[in-house]
Amino acid sequence: MEQRAYYSIREVTEMICNDRVLVLTALDETLSQLPTGNWIGGIANQNEVTYNEEGEPLLIQVNDLSQWVRSVHINSYQSFNFESIEKDAFTNGFSIITIPAFSSVHLSFAIYSATTPNWQHPVIGWIAGSECGTPKMRESVVVDGGTGEFYVERVVVMHCALYDNYKAWYDIINPFEPDLSKPRFKFPNASFNISECSVLENSAVEEGVKNDILNNTTELRTAFKPYADAHDIAIDAETTLITQLHGEYTTVSILMNLTGKSLILATPVIPGLSYYIGKRYLNEEDLFTVNADSVIFSVNCFYVPKPSPRSIASYGEVARFIYNHVAVRLHVSHSLDTIFGSKPQTAT
């Protein structure tokens, strides 16, 4: 069967029955028609429907990982056992995670990933949702294809063991950096909804400083939106807030600009962290060709060009932390290539 991005229910059913290892996105009523097997899935936006030669609608986005994976096990997790994600992973492998958008477990995972040590193996995935921030928004669900269970308050992870001669790694293509000419912000609560904030205005901007508290800093408590409006800070879907976690820039985008003083974010802010306004410093498409031959799976924000036709467009990109406005890519290479060859170029 030809490799393409979307397949019919019949075609995907055949793949599952042939023990293919699959990552799927579609509407929930479509995913509910599939048999159990080696797959995980998440709800997605409704795309324009195309048809195969048999006239069947191509409703399911498919990423087939069978070529590299010798075995899998699929688990679901709640906030009290996130630490088991690392424990359940294969020694030589990777894990694909999907999280229901704007659920309490989405919030909990954002906090957990920001406050725990680095994981020792690749975990990447996506925040699954459908028409989020619009009147057509559906309840966010993720699916454990091994059992057929649909979850609105659990994350689902497919742990994949690689064949012995392969190694997995990932990179993050992040086209944003902090705008040091603008103030920093702190928020009092871990939340998708922001209104009040503390503004940290520096009397002098120091080049190269990332998320450290500068000397001569004054703090102003105010409403975020009126402050942004008064200081010509754009508030729209492409506005990015940036903080630093374990030496890495992570990004948060605005999903909805509500009437009044509130904003709804695609990823929650974390109290105690300082957030900058982001500015674009490169064209992410320029990096898509770097190590492109080893990419087997990718996730991208709706506002980022797709690295490949099969890349999952998401409401959040997961690669250790949760990001917005980036692309994350999972690579598999022969072991010697990973050890002695070129390393991934990560733009962060």
Positions of PLM-derived features:
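Hydrophobic alpha/beta core scaffold segments
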Residues: M1-T348
